[in-house]
Amino acid sequence: MALNEQDVARIARLARIELTPDQRGRAQAELNGILHLIERLQAVDTQGVEPLAHPLSAHEDITLRLREDAVSEQATEASRAELLANAPESADGLFLVPKVIE
């Protein structure tokens, strides 16, 4: 799959970036290169290959070090009030934040 100039213009519009004709041409070449690489990766037979949790784990002895969740300090009503005093807005012991999803 190759992108044409109209595809790149549409992507730029959706991303809300303005591209000059020269930049559009370079972006088209770069995006087509990325798509070509993705096509090559999809063509590789990975049947029977164990997934990696970390990209270097195949070459080095890397294990994920997990720890138990533990309370590091006990919250008191005074410490909670002190923390909430730093908040621009709070109600009923909770931080109030602006709505971010419309």
UniProtKB/Swiss-Prot annotation:
Protein name: Aspartyl/glutamyl-tRNA(Asn/Gln) amidotransferase subunit C
Classification via InterPro entries: Asp/Glu-ADT_sf_sub_c (IPR036113), GatC (IPR003837)
UniProt record, GO biological process: glutaminyl-tRNAGln biosynthesis via transamidation; regulation of translational fidelity; translation
Enzyme class: ligase
NCBIfam families named in the record: gatC
Native source organism of the sequence: Bordetella bronchiseptica (strain ATCC BAA-588 / NCTC 13252 / RB50) (Alcaligenes bronchisepticus)
Membership in a protein family: Belongs to the GatC family.
Catalytic reaction annotation: L-glutamyl-tRNA(Gln) + L-glutamine + ATP + H2O = L-glutaminyl-tRNA(Gln) + L-glutamate + ADP + phosphate + H(+); L-aspartyl-tRNA(Asn) + L-glutamine + ATP + H2O = L-asparaginyl-tRNA(Asn) + L-glutamate + ADP + phosphate + 2 H(+)
Keyword tags: ATP-binding, Ligase, Nucleotide-binding, Protein biosynthesis
Entry-linked PANTHER family: GLUTAMYL-TRNA(GLN) AMIDOTRANSFERASE SUBUNIT C, MITOCHONDRIAL
HAMAP family referenced in this protein's UniProt entry, alphabetically: GatC
GO molecular function: asparaginyl-tRNA synthase (glutamine-hydrolyzing) activity; ATP binding; glutaminyl-tRNA synthase (glutamine-hydrolyzing) activity
Functional note: Allows the formation of correctly charged Asn-tRNA(Asn) or Gln-tRNA(Gln) through the transamidation of misacylated Asp-tRNA(Asn) or Glu-tRNA(Gln) in organisms which lack either or both of asparaginyl-tRNA or glutaminyl-tRNA synthetases. The reaction takes place in the presence of glutamine and ATP through an activated phospho-Asp-tRNA(Asn) or phospho-Glu-tRNA(Gln).
Subunit structure: Heterotrimer of A, B and C subunits.
E.C. no: 6.3.5.-
